[in-house]
Amino acid sequence: MAEELKAKGNAAFSKKDYKTAIDYFTQAIGLDERNHILYSNRSACYASEKDYADALKDATKCTELKPDWAKGWSRKGAALHGLGDLDAARSAYEEGLKHDANNAQLLNGLKSVEAAQTQAASGAGGFNPFAKLGSQLSDPKFMEKLASNPETASLLADSAFMAKLQKIQQNPGSIMAELNDPRMMKVIGMLMGIDINMNAGEGAAEEQEKKEEFAPSSSTPSADSAKPETTNPPPQPQASEPMEEDKTAEELEEAATKEALKKKADQEKQIGNENYKKRNFPVAIEQYKKAWDTYKDITYLNNLAAAYFEADQLDDCIKTCEDAIEQGRELRADFKLIAKALGRLGTTYQKRGDLVKAIDYYQRSLTEHRTPDILSRLKDAEKSKELQDREAYIDPDKAEESRVKGNELFKSGDFANAIKEYTEMTKRAPSDPRGFGNRAAAYLKVMAPAECIRDCNKAIELDPNFAKAYVRKAQALFMLKDYNKCIDACNEASEVDRREPNTGKNLREIESQLSKCMSAMASQRQNETEEETMARIQKDPEVLGILQDPAMQAILGQARENPAALMEHMKNPTVKSKIEKLIASGVIRLG
């Protein structure tokens, strides 16, 4: 990602779009703060914008990250020269030459600084009138001085000039380009304490005299004093200058070689891809190996790992993925490619049945880059691991131990700990309905009917002939005062209890529970008038459904003419349950 941004920055620099280039390099630095080339490139952009202060900051950072890189010192020297600090600029160029004595840019930069120093020293009496302008412009009292001077006070109302002045304050080195502006000369004169207008007039006259002479004498005192300082402008990077570094012939040849190798590697990869699609994995593997040996891009290793996986060479797949991750870190590869290698490791370990490692690698892959595919694989692996753990925990002998302990605790009245033992039994023997049935009985004792019903349903699912589970379910429904469902549960229990292996041994308990339910429903409608009964029935959808059933209407019609016929119909468990509900609701009155 950082390399892509750098390439975009280089392209913008070539087009002299320095602000856009700065933005791209800034983004790249955010992703790769230790890359010295990025700071060097951005320094060049700032220098092109004549923002030598920021150019110096980046150049300094570049030399801190890689002190032995000559290019960084060249950037620093150029920035210092732009700021007018010739001594420091010279030191920077000299430091760079210690690392690369033949670097043409450093040598040219040093010559430029030396020439500027010589020119500054050769002024009248060695006096350089513009040497300290930068510090004077940044003086907090500068604006106050400007306003108090009659010659410059009027400039405060000139917004265009004030904007120009503000830019010069930010970058004092750019003042040299504004010396033709008479307003700027007034400011310089105010700062230097001289009358620029007067001197300029004298200089103009003397300059005219100089023009009239074909061979002016070098000893003419006014010829030099009338001219503004002609310090060479600070060196600036040219648009055609390579951004990353100054390429020597050898380096250019190396870059061309790399490009050719990458192209050749991609051709090998393409052949590998074609064979992979044909499931010709041995050939695909060899092609991906050739691609990696030709050019170091972990895309080739990821492809190689995929081929090993499909060929069921899992050891080779794991090793290749590990190499891809290690090499990817060293090559600063895209995090998406590293995430892909981590995800492949997860898939490989899952195929081997090592779900612990599979889950770990899936999680690490998602940390690098989150994708729906890996997230789905992680969830599947976690579910499989949970199931695997449950199956590994199964132990019938320990389940029996927990059942015995639970029964003892139940008999002693310690229902809470009995529930714990029965829960352990359900984990050790999840297919044994007794664990759920016994825990349901304990839940009843601690007044937890909902939990009891849940366990009864599970026990019935495991063993449809478990009559005790139906009885306990009826008891829990009675506790919830859901009498209609309680009647259904009692009738189901009665039906199951008749079958083997029960043979009616729970009949008394079932009839007792049914009787309690009928009594409770009768007590609800005690002292109820017929009008109140009809109003209540109209609000009971289950009773209304029974009354609207054509078959039940026929049975009730027969019962009115022949009450004995009703007893015959009640031999059918379904009809019996419905008639009991009608009796309990008061639709049918006995006696």
Curated annotation (Swiss-Prot):
SUPFAM superfamilies tied to this protein: TPR-like
> What are the recorded GO MF terms, alphabetically?
ATPase inhibitor activity; Hsp90 protein binding
**Top-rank lineage group of the source organism:** Eukaryota
Provide the GO biological process annotations: protein folding
Q: Give the STI1 domain ranges.
A: 139-178, 530-569
Give start-end positions of Basic and acidic residues composition bias: 245-255
Presence of keyword Transport: no
Under which name does UniProt file this protein? Heat shock protein sti1 homolog
The organism's lineage is: Eukaryota, Fungi, Dikarya, Ascomycota, Taphrinomycotina
